[in-house]
């Protein structure tokens, strides 16, 4: 474990000089829970190591009780969420959306952000999309970077993970995408789908990347980690 932590710190040091936003002294809330198949605790561990390196003020909370108070949420500059499925109460939903609308950023990956609360269309409207399928399960596919400040200097890459098929808001700014083939569903052959996007919701900013079925994907693929961490910095108030 100690060896892995040292490796992670060295890895992070090598990646974070190219994007100017600084998280030092920013207040970050990390919320995790839901379906354990997406290993939210491991995702949060990687995020925590990064936040320590960035010298951010952070709090980690397991469960949706983190959204019980708007007065507490509005104190944060960024919420990083990793909750697949689960159910959010109306009060929690209102608190979260109000905080983001008033300037708190939010970001996350994979099902931890776009498959969180399937019954909450208000939440989906804020995030900008909803997962609906991953044809073939874990498959090999290519992620293509599009021109944007967050992708500057990043390379396209091949990865084996779930290739998310999304229902998404045309108002999002897509910064990375992928193309489906006809292996599992012939009618989606050639469909181009977002892999990462950014958007605004009121005064708040939203960042999402769809890879990360196994959180270690972000450690094993340099460009994926850069994309995630740059996006989270961008979303920070």
What are these regions (language model features)?
Residues 22-30, 53, 71, 184-193, ...:
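Extracellular ligand-binding/catalytic regions of CAZymes and related secreted enzymes
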Residues 51-54, 75, 134-208:
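Catalytic beta-strand/loop cores that center a nucleophilic Ser/Cys/Thr
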Residues 22, 26-31, 36-114, 218:
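Helical hinge/lid and interdomain linker segments adjacent to catalytic or ligand-binding clefts
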Residues 1-23:
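Bacterial Sec-dependent N-terminal signal peptides
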Residues 86-153:
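A glycine-rich, often tryptophan-bearing local segment used as a flexible ligand/cofactor-contacting loop or short
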Residues 111, 179, 211:
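Active-site donor-binding loop signature of nucleotide-sugar glycosyltransferases
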Residues 18-21, 68-71, 163-165, 197:
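Short, flexible, glycine/charge-rich loop motifs used to bind or transfer phosphoryl groups or to couple energy/partner
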């Amino acid at each position: 474990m100690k060896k892995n932590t040292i490796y992670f710190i060295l890895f992070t040091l090598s990646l974070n000089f190219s994007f100017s936003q600084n998280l030092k002294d920013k207040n970050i809330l990390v919320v995790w829970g839901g379906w354990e198949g997406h290993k939210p605790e491991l995702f949060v561990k990687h995020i925590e190591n990064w936040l320590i390196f960035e010298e951010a003020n952070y709090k980690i909370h397991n469960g949706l009780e983190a959204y019980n108070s708007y007065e507490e949420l509005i104190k944060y500059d960024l919420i990083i969420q990793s909750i697949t499925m689960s159910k959010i109460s109306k009060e929690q939903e209102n608190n979260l959306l109000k905080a983001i609308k008033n300037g708190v950023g939010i970001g996350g990956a994979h099902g931890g952000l776009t498959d969180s609360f399937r019954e909450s269309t208000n939440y989906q409207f804020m995030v900008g999309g909803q997962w609906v399928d991953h044809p073939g399960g874990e498959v090999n596919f290519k992620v293509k970077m599009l021109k944007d400040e967050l992708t500057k200097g990043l390379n396209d890459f091949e990865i084996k993970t779930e290739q998310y098929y999304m229902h998404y808001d045309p108002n999002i700014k897509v910064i990375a995408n992928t193309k489906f083939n006809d292996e599992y569903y012939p009618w989606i052959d050639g469909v181009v789908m977002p892999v990462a996007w950014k958007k605004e919701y009121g005064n708040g900013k939203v960042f999402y990347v769809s890879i990360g079925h196994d959180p270690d994907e972000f450690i094993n693929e340099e460009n994926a980690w850069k994309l995630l961490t740059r996006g989270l910095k961008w979303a920070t108030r």
